[in-house]
Amino acid sequence: LGDVYKRQSEQDSLTYIAAEKIYMKGESAPAKESFTRYLQSFPGGAFSLNAHYYLCVIGKEQKDDEAVLEHAGKLLEYPDNPYSEEALLMHGEILFNRQQYALALADYKKLQAKATTAERRQLGAIGVLRCGALMHDDAEVINAATALLAEAKLSPELRNEALYYRAKAYLNQKADKKAMDDLQLLAKDTRTLYGAEAKYLVALQWYNAGNYASAEKEILNFIDQSTPHAYWLARSFILLSDVYVAMDKKLDARQYLLSLQQNYQADDDIASMINERLEKLK
């Protein structure tokens, strides 16, 4: 019996090593066949996790989502194997691209919790942040953004994304003071899209609070700084006209609207916002 077992385990290793050699040569299609054959011949084989991992990677290379989901799914049945972090990443990414955000979120949360490197931990948190934002789950967004912002090495782009989504979540939760703190940090750089929108939102917060002087100051400062993101500058011009109406400076309000009407060319909702306000100012 011992001999039979020994022969079988030798056969197991030889079959696996042969498949791995083909893969290492960069021959994905025959390697895929060999790994698949290996798993069929040795279902619980000593190298079955490795084979599932390689089939996952080949599936990703060949843009075969079903293969990635199948083999990553198999790897995830063994929670603490050496491939589980990569499996969570690949599995989560496909679910995210398929707009199955709740399922992707679960993968990213596991990755965030068990990641062995800061980079993987960040990838998990970014996944949770983006899924949470798309699902309008403010608590998930706030937790993930806060975890990201506590990271020692975070790129400026990711810092901005985390601040932006956290600010939006705080606004939804009526946590205006916390939202304002995040928005004001973002608004320091209006060259970025998040910064330009944040600058507008800071002014909007002042306007909604009835603090018209601060709203006016914020917008005039935005006009001075300028931004490549013309839409948010235009929205700020419109907000400035609302501020002037509230301050009973209707003439100024009208002038800003007319100037915007002449200078703003894009085909979006700005024109209708201008017309709606000009109607009321007649």
Where do the protein language model's features map onto the residues?
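Acidic, polar-rich low-complexity tracts and alpha-helical solenoid repeat scaffolds
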Residues: G2-K282
